[in-house]
UniProtKB/Swiss-Prot annotation:
Transcription regulator that can specifically activate or repress expression of target genes. Residues 2-135 form the HTH marR-type domain. Belongs to the SlyA family. It comes from Yersinia pestis bv. Antiqua (strain Antiqua). The keyword DNA-binding applies. The gene is slyA. InterPro entries: HTH_MarR-typ, MarR/SlyA-like, Tscrpt_reg_MarR-type_CS, Tscrpt_reg_SlyA, WH-like_DNA-bd_sf, WH_DNA-bd_sf. Homodimer. Keywords: Activator, DNA-binding, Repressor, Transcription, Transcription regulation. GO terms for molecular function: DNA binding; DNA-binding transcription factor activity. One of its GO terms (biological process) is response to stress. This is Transcriptional regulator SlyA. Residues 49-72 bind DNA. The keyword Flavoprotein does not apply.
Length: 143
């Protein structure tokens, strides 16, 4: 029987995010919005749209619509990069701070619930295996 590990991991991410979605509904954020804000907050300040798209794992054109919506909500600003006028840098606004705190809180509490009953050693082993899988995939992509 062939391994369904890739499908299993993809399904895990889907159900994990699906659990978080209703918990963030009061903030009026779609999954795309909160995933984008979460990643902007985790990356070094003023990342480019290209870097953010890579971090999230989506194509840049798909990201642009989400960034337009977040900018309309007053949660981010974008400005042209001084070195490359084609590139745009993304910055969180002060208005986004309380929302980011709530998003982080929901994500952290949900993570604790999901990982309940799993030892820190087991989590470390799983994280190590995921890192190895990612490295293998990256090596295969560069061949």
């Amino acid at each position: 029987m062939e391994s369904t590990l890739g499908s299993d991991l993809a399904r895990l991410v889907r159900v994990w995010r699906a659990l978080i979605d209703p918990r963030l509904k009061p903030l009026e954020l779609t999954q795309t919005h909160w995933v984008t804000l979460y990643n902007i907050n985790r990356l070094p300040p003023e990342q480019s749209q290209i870097q953010l798209a890579k971090a999230i794992g989506i194509e840049q054109p798909s990201l642009v619509r989400t960034l337009d919506q977040l900018e309309e909500k007053g949660l981010i600003t974008r400005h042209t990069c001084a070195n490359d006028r084609r590139a745009k840098r993304i910055k969180l606004t002060e208005q986004s701070s309380p929302i980011i705190e709530q998003v982080d809180g929901v994500i952290c509490s949900t993570r604790k619930e999901i990982l309940g009953g799993i030892s820190s050693d087991e989590i470390a082993v799983l994280s190590g295996l995921i890192d190895k899988l990612e490295k293998n995939i990256i090596q295969l992509q560069t061949k």
